């Protein structure tokens, strides 16, 4: 007996619709994997389409250029996480120490230890050659993320829990170790060379050092793991 593949006309309409709805995410997943594996400049659009199981023409129906595809990869995997982070910050009812510790831990869970972390490595290694992407990254990722951390620090200062530090530079001091963890993950650690350490343990050490530097004598207290209800993780954080 000869088995023939179903033609599009014989595939149930509901199934075709589900496939169509899933296609943008499939393209974004394929693009993320290839951009991180090969680099943005070295990845061809037809490679993304092939990995997603569609034609190059279908890819362009959703994303008219490779640059627009990368922007959507960033939105899906990183920008959405920052938006959810801001919701958490503004709804949080605990101390600023607890909030800061919670956000640092959550960042590693949602971005640092997921495949989305490869985007940060990609930006650092290639963005100088793509000024439009650089502007997009600053506007959609760097600036909002910095504002979120600054809001937490300022919250602590206003309540008297934190010392009146330079907020802008405090933000840089908080973010830099997180970027180091990502770069190490995608460089030396990927080659199984260099010092071995547990990123979550490093983040706990960072929390301890930072809070002891920020807190006033009256505000000093251990930052217990917070029990805030965070928004559901977006699909971009797939491990």
Q: Where on the chain are the PLM-derived regions?
A:
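C-terminal peripheral helix-coil segments that are non-catalytic and often amphipathic
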Residues: 1-14, 98, 102-106, 143, ...
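Basic, helix-initiating cap at the start of DNA-binding domains
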Residues: 1-38, 42-54, 61-68
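Amphipathic, non-transmembrane alpha-helical scaffold segments
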Residues: 20, 28, 74, 134-146, ...
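Short amphipathic alpha-helical segment with a characteristic S/N-K-E followed by hydrophobic residues
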Residues: 27, 42, 65-70, 80, ...
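A conserved beta-strand->loop->alpha-helix hinge within the catalytic CA
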Residues: 47, 94-99, 166, 198
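Amphipathic alpha-helical linker/stalk segments
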Residues: 71-103, 109-111, 115, 119, ...
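Short secondary-structure transition hinges
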Residues: 83, 109-151, 193-196
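Membrane-interface starts of transmembrane alpha-helices
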Residues: 163, 167-171
């Amino acid at each position: 007996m000869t088995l023939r593949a179903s033609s599009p006309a014989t595939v149930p309409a509901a199934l075709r619709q589900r496939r169509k709805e899933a296609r943008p995410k499939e393209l974004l997943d394929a693009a993320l994997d290839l951009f991180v594996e090969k680099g943005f400049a070295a990845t061809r659009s037809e490679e993304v389409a092939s990995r997603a199981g569609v034609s190059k023409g279908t890819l362009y129906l959703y994303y008219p250029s490779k640059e627009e595809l990368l922007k959507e990869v960033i939105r899906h995997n990183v920008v959405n996480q920052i938006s959810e982070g801001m919701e958490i910050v503004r709804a949080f009812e605990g101390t600023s120490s607890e909030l800061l510790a919670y956000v640092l831990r959550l960042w590693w869970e949602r971005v640092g230890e997921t495949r989305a972390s490869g985007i940060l490595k990609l930006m650092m290694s290639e963005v100088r050659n793509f000024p439009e992407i650089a502007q997009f990254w600053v506007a959609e990722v760097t600036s909002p993320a910095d504002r979120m951390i600054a809001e937490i620090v300022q919250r602590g200062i206003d309540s008297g829990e934190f010392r009146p530090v330079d907020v802008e530079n405090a933000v840089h001091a908080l973010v830099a170790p997180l970027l180091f963890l990502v770069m190490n993950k995608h460089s030396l650690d990927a080659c199984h060379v260099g010092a071995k350490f547990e990123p979550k343990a490093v983040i706990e050490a960072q929390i301890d050092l930072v809070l002891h530097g920020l807190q006033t004598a009256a505000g000093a207290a251990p930052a217990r793991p917070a029990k805030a209800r965070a928004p559901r993780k977006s699909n971009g954080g797939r491990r």
